A protein has these predicted regions:
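Short proline/glycine- and acidic-rich turn/helix-capping motifs at secondary-structure junctions
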Residues: 126, 218-228
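N- or domain-start disorder-to-order transition segments that initiate the globular core
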Residues: 1-26
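Active/ligand-binding-proximal structured segments within catalytic/core domains
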Residues: 22-73, 245, 255-265
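Short acidic-hydrophobic surface loop/beta-edge motif
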Residues: 6-11, 222-224, 231-236
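Charge-rich, well-structured scaffold segments of protease-associated domains
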Residues: 9, 59-62, 67-216, 232, ...
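Short solvent-exposed loop/turn micro-motifs enriched in small/polar/acidic residues
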Residues: 1-2, 75, 224-227
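Short, surface-exposed beta-strand/loop micro-motifs that present aromatic residues
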Residues: 17-20, 177, 229-234
């Protein structure tokens, strides 16, 4: 597919890629913050980032509820989602080319001006609890955090994560957003039909984004250790066996190494 890539680095710390695909009929948006579970204030509230992500498309400066925002966002078929990992929180959206600006404005609105409220907070705590409880029947979901812990990574298992949910308050959500959602911590990729005028509009929107300056958090690298013995999870109710092998590199891979690993995988 014919395309050109332009790197953007703005004075307010925002960085990203603009990918021009001249014949594209849709626009794709990805926004990422280093705001995952490892960046929460305490392990006792580990699921703060996950719950905040679930509240990402709720009430904000323009819409009073998630229902109102969702109805407006998707009225022409646009799609959005969000995800949280140990390190990152990502927001994505896809839309038809003709409404790219409206969807970009709505995405930035939800990211920059959420109005976290108690009603949506209680609802999403329950949704996150149900989601994680469902993973307890997935052998792979149980195995990999145990392997990570065995190699020295400071992560929690799904059982441990569920136990932290009751510790989290609405103020924890607001605090985590304030800490992590800054212009310096924002990275983006936008792909579609990006004319010169569209690029100028996009850059202007990021330059005027209603977020404070802050910190681009360092990628967390734990001190690795060699497990003394294999990790076993005994589940007497299971009729099959799931197993995995993990090789740990004790540093962050550079871009070329990541590309090579993706090809290898």
């Amino acid at each position: 597919m014919k395309h050109t890539v332009e790197e953007v680095r703005l004075k307010n710390g925002v960085q990203g890629l603009l990918i021009d695909v001249p014949d594209a009929a849709v626009m794709n948006f990805t926004f990422q913050f280093r705001a995952g579970s490892r960046y929460t204030r305490s392990r006792d509230i580990y699921e703060t980032a996950h719950i905040m992500e679930h509240m990402a498309f709720g009430a904000n400066a323009r819409f009073n509820s998630e229902h109102e925002f969702e109805a407006d966002f998707t009225k022409n078929g646009a799609y959005h989602n969000a995800s949280t990992s140990d390190m990152n929180m990502s927001y994505i959206a896809d839309c038809a080319d003709f409404e790219w600006e409206r969807i970009l404005d709505l995405q930035l609105l939800s990211i920059a001006t959420p109005k976290f409220n108690e009603k949506e907070f209680i609802a999403e705590k329950g949704n996150v609890r149900n989601e994680l409880t469902g993973y307890l029947n997935n052998n792979a979901r149980l195995l990999w955090p145990k392997l990570q812990q065995a190699f020295g990574e400071q992560v929690l298992t799904y059982e441990e994560r569920i136990k932290t949910i009751s510790n989290i308050t609405l103020n924890d959500i607001k605090e985590h957003h304030k800490k992590t959602h800054t212009t310096d911590n924002l990275r983006f990729v936008i792909a579609g039909k990006l004319t010169k005028s569209r690029k100028s509009k996009i850059i202007e929107k990021f330059e005027n984004l209603d977020l404070p300056r802050g910190e681009r958090f360092e990628f967390i690298v734990d001190d690795p250790k060699v497990p003394e013995k294999p990790v076993y999870i005994n589940r007497s109710d299971q009729k099959n066996i799931s197993f995995g092998f993990s090789v740990i590199i004790p540093r962050q891979l550079d871009d070329y190494e990541m590309d090579a690993m993706h090809a290898l995988n």
